[in-house]
C-alpha cells in the first residue's frame, strides 16, 4: 500500500514546487498552481507524458496541428531553454513570466529581439523579419502582395537600422520599439494576472495591422 501511494504521488517530469517558482517570477503561488492545471491540459493533449512537445504547443497556440508554423516554432524554441525538444513545467512558468504585465519592459524587449534573431547572430536581419512577417500574415489569414511586404520591410529597416549596415542590433531594436511601443503588444498578456485554464491566446492580428498601417 505504501509503495503504491508513493508511486501514485510521484511528481511529473519537470514538476517544480509552486512556492519556489512563485519566488522566481511575477506569479503568486495560486497562479502557479493554476498554471500547472493549464500545463497538464496542454501536455496531455497528444502524449500524456507530463511534457509539452512541439505538436502540443502548436495545437494549443493555433489550434492547428496540420502544418508547422515558423512563429510557433520560434516561441517553442525560446520556451525550451534546456534544448531537449520538450517543455517541462518549470520552463513553461519561467517563459510565460516574460509576458506578465508586471515584468520590466527591458525583459520583454530582450525576448522579442531573440524571437526575431532566428540565426542567433546577435542581429536581426531583413530575411528574418520577412520570414516572421509572412508567418504572422499566414496565421492571421491576411494576404499581402510581395511588393507591399517589401515596402513594409523597407520602412522597418529605414526606421530601425540607424547605422545602415543592413541589420538591426540590440540597441537599435530597443530604440525602435521605444518609438513604436505597439510592436510589444504581444509581449504583455493582461489576463496572466488572472490565470484560467484557457491557454493564453497569442493573437497577432493587431501587430500585423500595426505593421501594415
Swiss-Prot record:
InterPro entries for this protein: CNBL1-10, EF-hand-dom_pair, EF_Hand_1_Ca_BS, EF_hand_dom
Binding site for Ca(2+) 1: 117, 119, 121, 128
CDD domains: EFh
GO molecular function: calcium ion binding; kinase binding
Sorted UniProt keywords: Calcium, Lipoprotein, Membrane, Metal-binding, Myristate, Repeat, Vacuole
Induction remark: By salt and drought stresses, abscisic acid (ABA) and gibberellin.
Binding-site residues, Ca(2+) 2: 161, 163, 165, 167, 172
Gene3D superfamilies in the cross-refs: EF-hand
Entry superkingdom: Eukaryota
Pfam families named among the record's database cross-references: EF-hand_7 (PF13499)
Covalently lipidated residues, kind N-myristoyl glycine: 2
Record localization: Vacuole, Aleurone grain membrane
Cellular component annotations (GO), alphabetically ordered: aleurone grain membrane; vacuole
EF-hand domain location: 31-66, 67-102, 104-139, 148-183
Site (Involved in dimerization): 140
GO biological process: calcium-mediated signaling
Topological category with respect to the lipid bilayer: Lipid-anchor
Tissue: Expressed in roots, shoots, culms and scutellum.
Signal peptide: none
Coiled-coil annotated residue ranges, if any: none
Similarity remark: Belongs to the calcineurin regulatory subunit family.
Known function: Acts as a calcium sensor. CBL proteins interact with CIPK serine-threonine protein kinases. Binding of a CBL protein to the regulatory NAF domain of a CIPK protein lead to the activation of the kinase in a calcium-dependent manner.
Subunit architecture: Homodimer.
UniProt protein name: Calcineurin B-like protein 1
Lineage of source species: Eukaryota, Viridiplantae, Streptophyta, Embryophyta, Tracheophyta
Gene: CBL1
Amino acid at each position: 500500500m505504501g509503495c503504491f501511494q508513493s508511486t501514485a504521488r510521484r511528481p511529473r517530469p519537470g514538476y517544480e514546487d509552486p512556492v519556489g517558482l512563485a519566488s522566481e517570477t511575477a506569479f503568486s503561488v495560486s497562479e502557479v498552481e493554476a498554471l500547472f492545471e493549464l500545463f497538464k491540459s496542454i501536455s496531455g493533449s497528444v502524449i500524456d507524458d507530463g511534457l509539452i512537445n512541439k505538436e502540443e504547443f502548436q495545437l494549443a497556440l493555433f489550434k492547428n496541428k496540420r502544418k508547422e508554423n515558423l512563429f510557433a516554432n520560434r516561441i517553442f524554441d525560446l520556451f525550451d531553454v534546456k534544448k531537449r525538444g520538450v517543455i517541462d513545467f518549470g520552463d513553461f512558468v519561467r517563459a510565460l513570466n516574460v509576458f506578465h504585465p508586471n515584468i520590466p519592459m527591458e525583459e520583454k524587449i530582450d525576448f522579442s529581439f531573440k524571437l526575431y534573431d532566428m540565426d542567433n547572430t546577435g542581429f536581426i536581419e531583413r530575411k528574418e523579419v520577412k520570414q516572421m512577417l509572412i508567418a504572422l500574415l499566414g496565421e492571421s489569414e491576411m494576404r499581402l502582395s510581395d511588393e507591399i511586404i517589401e515596402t513594409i520591410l523597407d520602412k522597418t529597416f529605414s526606421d530601425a537600422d540607424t547605422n545602415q549596415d543592413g541589420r538591426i542590433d540590440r540597441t537599435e531594436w530597443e530604440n525602435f520599439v521605444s518609438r513604436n511601443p505597439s510592436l510589444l503588444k504581444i509581449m504583455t498578456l493582461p489576463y496572466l494576472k488572472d490565470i484560467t485554464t484557457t491557454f493564453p491566446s497569442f493573437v497577432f492580428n493587431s501587430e500585423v495591422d500595426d505593421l501594415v498601417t
